[in-house]
Amino acid sequence: MKAIILAAGKGSRLYPVTLNKPKGLLKIGNETILDRLIRQFRDLGINDILLVVGFKKEIFKDHFGDEVRYREYGNFDNTNNLHTLWSINDELNNDVIISFADLVLHDEVIYKLIQSPGEIVMAVDTSQVLKNTMRVEVDNDRLLSIKTTTIKNSSGNFIGLAKFNSKGCKRLLSGMKKIINGNYDDYYTLAIDNMSRSGKMVNYCDINGILWREIDTKYEYDEVLKISHLFNNDKKID
């Protein structure tokens, strides 16, 4: 299994904090966001880690060196991560976890996702419905919709982490190919939403309140800094 971390964007909603530094390299306690995430993947046996970089790509390479692999995406100013992920579609060929680059979470979240069955498994949190991140609708073991769901109909939130096996990768590639012309502002999850709304099986892993945060704004970053000590108590996975 490999991990692909989508880290090409500018993080403009975090300005001025991210004017000269990618948000994945912001500090949470003694580690950067991505130092922590990469360590967590490795602790759970995922050693093939690919960073998709764009904005300030040289800072990532100086920071991580040969610790990870890199692919560069140059059009980060004009597109969202649907196009970022499509630019490395040749990497979607076997078991893979795709992660946003701004996640702070407990080890158990990744562990639960790895253990969850299904060709496509989206990590969601049904313990709350947040306004400023992707919302989902679920029923039993299947995902019904993602992103376009109204708060009233939402079951919870997508946390920015998903797993695909080889068949799931083929389905993802097929779904992205159908929408890649245009849709410059969309996330790759549009392809997942189209699948689920058409009745195709998309599974989900419910982390159900295990601590996680996605950092998109200065307010969210400040809030995570206030509770950073809570992320130091990761549950040990045997």
Q: Where do the language-model regions lie?
A:
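N-terminal nucleotide-binding beta1-loop-alpha1 segment
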Residues: 1-18
